[in-house]
């Protein structure tokens, strides 16, 4: 599990090092420490919206008797610690910090968010084929729709906080903890309800994203991949170009 969820960040760091050397790695990691945006309201929105959406879906699922049940306190505390070091920290630097930043160099924030959301959703697809994963008990279409819609919301956060990855980490953590409140397996009613709620959030998020490419993408702090000569990139990796 840890290997899977940390793979986006590991790959992003590897690509940054290969193409840009240590400066690329420093630039990518700099997205974590670039300071909070002046518009701090978006950090609060990032925490409250996912949690409120998940809790609302849990309430609806429980009302409809779909089997949703809250976790015991001990399990909730364990899940809290687990989520700190898994999805939120393991994925966001790679998906939003690296890939979304580069997508926005050639695409509008709106189109980049859609491409990012679809890619991120499909990345979760193999979870349906591994025994013991909670996705095996969820409707695939609803789950993928939910993840893609949430990904669009994360793209909005990333842009509105000027590429501060901590904002999307907080939102991702809030979302995962919201799921934990209701337990890992909540039934199809819960997943479909959550997919519907986040679809509405995604529509509003797309409306707030620009439809036109910007000269300086919000999260961009390093040049496009491949801008350095091949020999320089090989030298950065301590390889002999000959």
Q: Where are the predicted features?
A:
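Membrane-helix interface linkers and caps
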Residues: 1-45, 60-73, 157-163, 206-220
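Functionally important transmembrane alpha-helices
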Residues: 138-196
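Short, highly charged, low-complexity non-transmembrane loops/tails of multi-pass membrane proteins
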Residues: 214-237
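Membrane-helix boundary elements
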Residues: 106, 110-135
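Aromatic-anchored segments of alpha-helical transmembrane domains
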Residues: 51-58, 118-127, 172-181
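Residue-level signature of the transmembrane alpha-helical core
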Residues: 6, 47, 80-85, 114-121, ...
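Membrane-interface helix/loop boundary segments of multi-pass membrane proteins
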Residues: 90-117, 159-164
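Juxtamembrane helix-entry segments on the extracytoplasmic side of multipass membrane proteins
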Residues: 68-81, 132-145
